């Protein structure tokens, strides 16, 4: 849908603090950012948790540059599927819901032909 945002290693982190304390989520976000992982965020927002994506972006922005390529996909594999490319700096103020999956690129992620691509390291890519 987005292109090839995830290659090699990546982290998948839920932003729901119903079963995981927010402090643990913060620790995971910082670790993934420090390790230069591509990061997938799910459960980014709900009726009660409207600010978790903003808070997660603030944590990532402590380590990751604001121009980092990000992608949003709503309703993956369902009718009405929609994808958007943005940057981490812009993602902070983006409206999302529980049907949205957020992809944060790493230092090698680029937009190529309108797609989010994280190269595996081959020459010329």
What are these regions (language model features)?
Residues 1-38:
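Class I SAM-dependent methyltransferase SAM-binding "motif I" and its flanking Rossmann-like core
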Residues 34-125:
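A contiguous loop/helix-start segment that scaffolds small-molecule binding in enzyme catalytic cores
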């Amino acid at each position: 849908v987005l292109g090839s945002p995830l290659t090699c290693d990546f982290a998948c982190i839920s932003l729901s603090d119903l079963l995981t304390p927010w402090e643990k989520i913060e620790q995971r976000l910082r670790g993934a950012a420090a390790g230069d992982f591509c990061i997938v965020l799910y459960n980014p927002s709900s009726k009660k948790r409207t600010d978790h994506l903003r808070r997660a972006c603030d944590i990532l922005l402590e380590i990751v540059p604001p121009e980092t390529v990000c992608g949003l996909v709503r309703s993956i594999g369902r009718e009405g599927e929609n994808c958007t490319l943005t940057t981490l700096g812009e993602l902070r103020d983006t409206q999302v819901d529980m049907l949205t999956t957020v992809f944060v690129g790493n230092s090698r992620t680029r937009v190529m032909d309108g797609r989010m691509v994280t190269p595996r390291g081959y020459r010329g890519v």
